[in-house]
Amino acid sequence: MTDRAPAVESSDRLSERGSMAYLLWFFALVYLVEGLGQIGGLIAQPLTYYLKQVQGWTPVQITAYLTLFNLPWIIKPLYGLVSDFIPLFGYRRKSYLLIANAAATCGFLLVSRLTVPDQLVFALMLTAYAMAISSTLCGAVLVENGQRLKESSTFINQQWLWYNVAAMTAAIVGGQLVQRLVPTAALHTAAALVSAAPLLVIFGTLFLIDEKKAPMNIQGMKHTFEGLSIAFRRRHLWIIAAFIFLYYFSPGLSTPLYFIMTDNLKFSQAYIGFLGSLAGAGWIAGAFLHRRYLKKLTLKKLLNLSIAIGTLASLAFLFFWNETTAAIISFCAGLAAMIATVATLTLAADYCPRRAEGFAFAVLMSIINLSTALADNLGSYLFTDVFHRKLEPLVLLSAAFTAFAFVLVPLIHLGQKRQGDPAVAAMAPPPPDSR
C-alpha cells in the first residue's frame, strides 16, 4: 500500500474494509437527526395544536400552511446538482452539510422566540431547506453505493429504521409537551429541544467523514448531463416516475385524523403523541420484518405485497373508534408504510441512471414529496368541504387509491428482478477513461 494522508483515505477505507459498516452508521446518524428535525418530527404536534387552538385554523388551513414546507423537498434535484459540481471551500459534501445543519439549528432557535404564523413561516422554512439539503446528500451516497454493492434495500431499510426510532421519540415528547404546557410554550419548547439535533450531523461531518478536496469538475458535469439526456429520453424511467407519483397520491388522513381524535374521540394530546410513537414502532417492526423475511423477494412481489398491506391498513381506519383500536391501527399503519417505503425507494434507487445517480434519485424523491403534499391537501379538502368532517368516506377513497396501484405494477415490467440489482447499466454512457 502507498502512504497517504489520513484526511484523504475515506474511499480507500470503504473499499478495503468493506464499506457497509461505515455507510450504515452514516445513514443512521443523518436519518436520526432528520426524524427529529423535519417539520413532521418533534415540532409537528405542538405546531398543529398551536395553529388549531391559538389561531383557530381549520384542517384545510393547517394542511396548506404545512404544505409550504414541502417546497424545499420538491426542489431537491437542485441541491444535488450544486453539490456535485460546485465544491464549497474545496468540498462537495462536507461544507454543505456543515452550513445546512448550522442553519437548521439557527432556524429552530428562531422559532422558539416567534409566535405569529407569518413570522414563523420564514424560520420554519429555513429548517426545511436545511433538512432537505442534508437528505439530498445522504440520498446521493445511498444510490452510488447501493448500486455498487447491490444493497439499495439494505441501506433504505437502515435509513428508515433510524428515522422512525427518532420519530417514535419525537411523537412521545411532542405529545407530552402539548399535554403539559400551553400551546405557545409547547411550540417554543419543542423548537428549542430540536435545535440541538443538527449538531449531531455537524459532529459527524467534522469527525467521521474524510473527503478529498476537489476542483469544479466541468468535464464531469458534461458527462453527467449526457447521461441525464439519455436517461430522460428513456420511456421506462418516465413510467417509473409516473408509478411512484400515483402510488403515493392517496388522499391524506393525517390532519383529518388529528381533528377526529381531538374533537370527536376526545383523546388527550399525550395519547395522540403516544399513537404517533406506536406508528413509529410499526415502521421499526416493518424494517425488521423486511430484513428477516422479505429481502429475498423479487421487487415485483414486494411491491404487490406492499400495496395489499397498505390497502388493508387504510381500510382499518374504518374501525378507528377508541383508544384500543386506534393503538392497533396506528401500529399496523406504520408497519405497512415501512414496507411501502422500502419497496418504492428500492425501485427508485435501482433505476437511477449511472453518473447521474444523485440527481435522478433526488428527482424521484421530489416526485414522492409533491405527490404526498397534493394528496394531503386533497384529503383535508374532501374531509372538510365534501364529506362534512366524516372520516369513513375519506378512508374508503384512500384505500381505493392505494389498491389502484395493483393495476400499475405490470406496466413497469420488473420480471424477476431482485431488490438491489441495478437495472440501469446501459442507461448512461460509461465514465471517461481519463481523469
Indicate where each model-derived feature is located.
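Juxtamembrane intracellular "pre-TM" segments in multi-pass secondary transporters
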Residues: 6-20, 210-240
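Helix-loop junctions at membrane interfaces in 12-TM secondary transporters
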Residues: 111-124, 318-330
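Helix-loop boundary and gating motifs at the non-cytosolic
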Residues: 9-73, 238-243, 247-264, 272
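Multi-pass alpha-helical transporter architecture, strongest
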Residues: 111-112, 198-208, 394-428
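A membrane-interface helix-boundary motif in multi-pass transporters
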Residues: 92-95, 178-196, 381-403
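C-terminal transmembrane helical hairpin of 12-TM major facilitator-type secondary transporters
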Residues: 300-344
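Helix-to-loop junctions at the C-terminal end of transmembrane segments
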Residues: 75-91, 285-299, 383-384
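Glycine-rich segments within core transmembrane alpha-helices of 12-TM secondary carriers
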Residues: 73-76, 154-174, 365-376
